[in-house]
């Protein structure tokens, strides 16, 4: 009897802690949504759609507030940038992209920024300097948030070009995916891609991996042996906290802070960059906040990852975790693209 009472007491305490954490997360998300609306000037309809996605998720946010300990504060980030006279606003980029804090995607070898056909968020969502990236977001939710804001999820080659400083023609080996299951298709395509680009490996900030250049000197929670919501804090930095973590095209935090969802097409009809409503499979790009001390996997710009927790981008059960966020792309001159098909 005493044991039963003790178990019930423990369960009640755990439930109360979870309820309080849920309440804090919702409050943090409401504050974040207000900040997004104020900075970006999205329409009420756009914000209603994003609000429904964020508040309806139950997990999406800037980390589990019960355990997350961010590596730096928003105030310290803001003060540091002000002291260095750094302002991330770029009027030329805004004219080209039609939005704040986006960078044109192009190949400087034969194009200029004004000829870009797409743009990418300069920071991880919410795409606001000195704000923490949103994590615990499924790939399907990320795609829907981007669509609600008149943007879209980036294709893998767009992210790679933004990082490496030149968006080249897509080189997906769709022929290697024909007739294959998703996992096998990804394995064959990535092997060919990584072999083709591995000799020219580079990072967003230069040709060699460099500690201290990006937001990657953080620490995992002591209880984080796997990836559970209650064990792993999203101990990220504010975005833009490291001005040196900048690609040649003016995009920040592609290495470190939070890894990012991207769309990996397995055939030409799954390319978001060409206007397709049917997306491909999930791919994780970049790296996250512990890479100065523990490099969990390669993170050079054009490296393509294994099919970790893989599935269709629009699968309602697509993967989410404590160090995985996203950023959006935008096809220039279209005012957005149709919503992706589930």
Language model features: what each stretch is:
Residues 41-43, 47-157, 163, 256:
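A short glycine-rich, aromatic-capped structural motif
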Residues 2-8:
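Sec-dependent signal peptide recognition
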Residues 10-18:
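Hydrophobic h-region of N-terminal signal peptides that target proteins for export
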Residues 95-98, 105-115, 119, 145-146, ...:
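Extracellular/periplasmic catalytic domains that process cell-envelope and extracellular macromolecules
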Residues 21-38, 133-140, 147-152, 163, ...:
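Disulfide-stabilized, aromatic/cysteine-rich ligand-recognition loop
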């Amino acid at each position: 009897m005493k044991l039963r009472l003790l178990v019930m007491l423990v369960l009640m305490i755990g439930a109360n802690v979870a309820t309080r954490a849920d309440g804090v997360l919702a409050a943090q998300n409401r504050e974040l949504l207000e900040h997004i609306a104020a900075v970006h000037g999205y329409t009420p309809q756009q914000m209603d759609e994003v609000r429904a996605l964020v508040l309806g998720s139950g997990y999406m946010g800037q980390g589990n507030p019960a355990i997350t300990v961010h590596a730096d504060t928003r105030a310290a980030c803001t003060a540091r940038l002000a002291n260095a006279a750094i302002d991330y606003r770029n009027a030329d980029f805004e004219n080209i992209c039609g939005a704040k804090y986006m960078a044109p995607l192009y190949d400087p070898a034969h194009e200029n920024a004004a000829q870009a056909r797409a743009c990418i968020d300069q920071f991880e969502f919410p795409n606001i300097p000195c704000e923490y990236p949103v994590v615990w977001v499924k790939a399907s939710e990320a795609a829907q948030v981007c669509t609600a804001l008149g943007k879209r999820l980036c294709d893998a080659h767009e992210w790679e070009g933004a990082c490496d400083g030149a968006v080249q023609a897509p080189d997906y080996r769709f022929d290697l995916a024909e007739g294959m299951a998703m996992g096998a298709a990804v394995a064959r395509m990535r092997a060919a891609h990584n072999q083709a680009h591995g000799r020219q490996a580079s990072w967003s900030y230069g040709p060699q991996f460099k500690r201290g250049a990006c937001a990657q000197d953080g620490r995992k929670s002591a209880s984080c042996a796997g990836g559970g919501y209650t064990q792993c804090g999203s101990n990220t930095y504010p975005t833009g906290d490291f001005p040196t973590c900048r690609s040649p095209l003016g995009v920040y935090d592609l290495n470190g802070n939070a890894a990012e969802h991207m769309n990996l097409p397995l055939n030409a009809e799954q390319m978001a960059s060409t206007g397709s409503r049917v997306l491909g499979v999930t791919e994780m790009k970049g790296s996250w906040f512990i890479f100065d001390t523990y490099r969990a996997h390669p993170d050079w710009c054009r490296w393509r990852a294994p099919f970790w927790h893989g599935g269709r981008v629009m699968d309602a059960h697509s993967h989410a975790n404590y160090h995985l966020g996203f950023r959006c792309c935008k096809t220039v001159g279209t005012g957005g693209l149709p919503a992706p098909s589930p």
